[in-house]
């Protein structure tokens, strides 16, 4: 399979993941957050803000996926977002609070970013 096709599919899957995470953050009841390791959480603003952020990012991933060659800046934005998220989440987990969902999210963002990077490099190398 061509790297462009794989990259496009991956970006659509990342968009779906981000949209679902965003929607879940917005609608999940606060008491349910205990399951994910966030005990004692009482406010809804930051939960909703994080949800909206994920939905906005899913739109960026969809636009990037529609034509990876037309908007390469969105590939770089995707990589930047995923690797900043990785550093933040893993740093938070290891320095501040051992919340299992934070660790899982950090690993997930790293893997998504890594695969986007590898497919983008493969795709741009094939174009030369």
What positions do the PLM features span?
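Membrane-helix boundary connector in multi-pass membrane proteins
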Residues: 66-69, 87-104, 121-122
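Residues within membrane-spanning alpha-helices of integral membrane proteins
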Residues: 8-11, 15-18, 51-54, 75, ...
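Membrane-helix boundary elements
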Residues: 4-44
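Membrane-water interface at the C-terminal end of transmembrane alpha helices
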Residues: 111-128
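Core segments of alpha-helical transmembrane spans in multipass integral membrane proteins
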Residues: 19-24, 42-65, 77-83
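Membrane-embedded alpha-helical segments of multi-pass transporters/permeases
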Residues: 26, 62, 90, 114-117
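Membrane-interface helix-boundary motifs at transmembrane edges
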Residues: 2-4, 66-71
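Non-cytosolic membrane-interface motifs at loop->transmembrane helix junctions
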Residues: 34-45, 73, 77, 98-108
């Amino acid at each position: 399979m061509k790297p462009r096709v794989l990259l496009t599919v991956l970006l659509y899957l990342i968009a779906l993941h981000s949209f679902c995470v965003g929607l879940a953050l917005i609608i999940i009841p606060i008491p349910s957050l205990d399951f994910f390791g966030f005990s004692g959480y009482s406010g809804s603003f930051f939960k909703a803000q994080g949800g909206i952020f994920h939905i906005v990012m899913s739109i960026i991933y969809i636009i990037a996926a529609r034509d990876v060659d037309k908007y390469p800046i969105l590939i770089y934005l995707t990589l930047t977002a995923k690797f900043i998220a990785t550093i933040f989440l893993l740093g938070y987990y290891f320095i501040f609070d051992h919340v299992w969902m934070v660790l899982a999210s950090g690993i997930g963002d790293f893997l998504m970013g890594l695969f986007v990077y590898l497919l983008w490099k493969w795709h741009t190398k094939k174009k030369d």
